[in-house]
């Protein structure tokens, strides 16, 4: 597992920042998986966050790990992917999502990763650790 993935797991909840025209929007997320060294996330196709990312794919994910008082900034460009293996992995790790994303509800899970990305772990003393991304 990558340091990025481990940090997101330790934090539990992370925050995804998008833009709605000139208005920043931030919301908590928790769904993520790693496959082949890349981190993948998911949102619903029926949500504003999805429409915002389609319109402006530049986003930032921030996670805070309270035990160490460090935080992660993961910034990049959203790229939506169609990956049955990643989708199945998400459903295995978060089975409750099957109740939301299925033929009966009509809702679709949109899986994305970040490209042209940077990731840093920072602390209150000003230390910055640049993470290597795949």
PLM features: residue spans?
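Short glycine/serine/proline-enriched coil/turn segments at secondary-structure junctions
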Residues: 23, 68-70, 122
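Hydrophobic/aromatic beta-strand elements that line small-molecule binding cavities or substrate pockets
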Residues: 29-32, 76-78
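Charged, gly/pro-rich active-site loop segments
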Residues: 73-134
């Amino acid at each position: 597992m990558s340091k990025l993935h481990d940090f997101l797991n330790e934090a539990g909840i992370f925050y995804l920042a998008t833009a709605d025209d000139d208005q920043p929007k931030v919301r908590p997320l928790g769904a993520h998986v790693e496959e082949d060294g890349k981190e993948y996330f998911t949102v619903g196709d029926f949500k504003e966050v999805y429409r915002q990312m389609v319109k402006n794919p530049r986003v930032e994910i921030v996670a805070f790990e309270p035990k160490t008082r460090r935080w992660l900034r993961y910034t990049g460009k959203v790229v939506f992917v169609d990956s049955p293996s990643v989708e199945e992995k998400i459903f295995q790790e978060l089975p409750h999502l099957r109740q939301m994303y299925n033929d009966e509800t009509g809702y679709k899970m949109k899986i994305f990763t970040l490209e042209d990305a940077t990731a840093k772990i920072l602390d209150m003393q000003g230390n910055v650790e640049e993470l290597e991304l795949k």
